[in-house]
Amino acid sequence: MTALWVIVLCGALSIVYAIWATSSVLAADQGNARMQEIAGAVREGAQAYLKRQYMTIAIVGVVIFALLAYFLGILVAIGFAIGAILSGAAGFIGMNVSVRANVRTAQAATTSLAGGLELAFKAGAITGLLVAGLALLGVTLYFIYLIHFAGLQANSRTVVDALVALGFGASLISIFARLGGGIFTKGADVGGDLVGKVEAGIPEDDPRNPATIADNVGDNVGDCAGMAADLFETYAVTAVATMVLAAIFFGSATPDQLQSVMTLPLAIGGICILTSIAGTFFVKLGASQSIMGALYKGLIATGVLSLVGVGVVIHQLIGFGPLPGVSYTGLALFECGIVGLAVTGLIIWITEYYTGTDFRPVKSIAQASVTGHGTNVIQGLAISMESTALPAIVIIAGILITYSLAGLFGIAIATTTMLALAGMIVALDAFGPVTDNAGGIAEMAGLPKEVRKSTDALDAVGNTTKAVTKGYAIGSAGLGALVLFAAYNEDLKFFIAQKSPYFVGVAPDFSLNNPYVVVGLLFGGLLPYLFGAMGMTAVGRAAGAIVEEVRRQFREKPGIMKGTDKPDYGKAVDLLTKAAIKEMIIPSLLPVLSPIFVYFAIYAIAGGGAAGKSAAFSAVGAMLLGVIVTGLFVAISMTSGGGAWDNAKKYIEDGHHGGKGSDAHKAAVTGDTVGDPYKDTAGPAVNPMIKITNIVALLLLAILAH
């Protein structure tokens, strides 16, 4: 029991760090009146959007809460509410810091690059540590409540279902935040670029463009609030799925041993919060003035400290010796943890290779832009497809090594360790929107060239960190979903062995010569494509509306271009808020309803009865794998491809192939316009979609068993 309270203490420390860092960020200078005015507009827009988004989610949430309470009892419904509320809180607080840090970063950059870096990173670290801390506290405190105050057995079904529902609550927020935020940010970006850069020939973040404020609002709601919700969900879901597997695999152990093994994923999360906090103090500009180097110092320090920490935790909780009822040792689990950290490092490195301006892929797209728009798009698509190969091979190796060391539980521990670094990784990601906004504010407020140089350098790195963290989010989501699939499979076996009334006579057959399995695989495989298509279409529609609006303002107020009239920024923000909220509902329900639809459709087609149930459970299981396989590739190709397109444009803007305004630059802007919704809307939203499908299947089992 003491172990659980120590974990709570670790979670509480992350909140203490966040409070300390927030006060230090808010104490910084906010710059001149013009800068504060711009930042105020961005802040207002972001808050208005989030308020509306959360109200929409709340309506859906109340319905689901009532359904869960009816089918699975109030404890499970409360778990769902905890997951949703905490996930929403992490994104909301993080974004509120981010929209206050942007102007302070721009001001700090007027004195030194190091000052700007320190402020922007600190703002990011607040979001990062809140994500890890609140996710850990939510799962741990509810687990403590269930086993100590509600008096339930650690592996009882109510505990398992309540924790799965907590993951589902986080998932629901994350798919809405990712999709809605993505539609908003890219509608503004693409629409603003098409009229501003291409038609009117004005630079990015020019105050004359009516869509600029909306674009800066979008960075915060998409990359800060959206990413926070996404990784909060993966963190919570993986911890829960690992606990579910522990409850099943170690069912024969003594209650104390069982509790120790079930606490293990939480303890790994706890120690890694401490290592992430320590890691933030390593982020300092060195003699080389490399910003990416400074950030990587923090990441590497966190990784090395985590390696030691995870070893200590496993040794203290379960020892390195043999474990009860299974064939592997505690040492093997530690080795799986090492593999998890290695996979994290490799995926980050590979993503940087595909999206950084120093490497072949981005340079090849820039080179292709010289010959025109078509060749830019062709090369970009080629890179987006190529970028899936190496991450997939790394994930394959990770699965094979950990499975040979400690079976399915080994894969789960590796994934847990990978996710335990989420605090540091989200910090790198949330650094992005702060620097992006700082650059926008510096441009709009007309700050001197040398300040723009500093903010541009920070922003370029921010773009890379955003891409890199997306790679990590997808890899961990794929592995997390695999752990959830294992939980589905083991849960199914458990209910059949327990002879639950509904499961009598059920014998699922996952062999590939079962046509229902093939049908399930194909159905699961189509979901990420359909979902991605809905996301891309939504951005296209939103961008179209913005193009019309910006053209209207230029037409009706000719003084805008001369600088005598002020554009109406609020109109674009309002238009996008409505569009994003409307467009996010239907795609978000796709992964929630699919498993239920497949189950009952196949059950009816296969003739009902025990045979129908067997066919339906096999089809749903296969569907989950189908979603994981294609989802992983769709998400990686979209995020890496989109990131490469974006940075190819930046590479040309840095003075290669004719620089800004050249024909190559115009072609690169086209590529970037395609890459934007790829990397910031459809790609990242596939993550939560993969996990929701798996979680709904787990809850479906629980509901049928009741």
UniProtKB/Swiss-Prot annotation:
Sequence positions that bind Mg(2+) 1: D189, D193
A Pfam family per the record: H_PPase
Alphabetically ordered keywords of this record: Calcium, Cell inner membrane, Cell membrane, Hydrogen ion transport, Ion transport, Magnesium, Membrane, Metal-binding, Translocase, Transmembrane, Transmembrane helix, Transport
Residues carrying the site annotation Determinant of potassium independence: K466
EC number: 7.1.3.1
N-terminal signal peptide: none
Cellular location(s): Cell inner membrane
Domain of life assignment: Bacteria
Residues that hold Mg(2+) 2 according to the record: N216, D219, D436
Cofactor list: Mg(2+)
Reaction(s) this enzyme catalyzes, per UniProt: diphosphate + H2O + H(+)(in) = 2 phosphate + 2 H(+)(out)
Gene Ontology CC terms: plasma membrane
Single GO MF annotation: inorganic diphosphate phosphatase activity
Record InterPro entries: PPase-energised_H-pump (IPR004131)
Record-annotated membrane-spanning stretches: 1-21, 62-82, 83-103, 129-149, 164-184, 231-251, 263-283, 300-320, 330-350, 393-413, 414-434, 467-487, 516-536, 585-605, 616-636, 685-705
Known function: Proton pump that utilizes the energy of pyrophosphate hydrolysis as the driving force for proton movement across the membrane. Generates a proton motive force.
UniProt family annotation: Belongs to the H(+)-translocating pyrophosphatase (TC 3.A.10) family. K(+)-insensitive subfamily.
UniProt name for this protein: K(+)-insensitive pyrophosphate-energized proton pump
Name of the gene this protein is made from: hppA
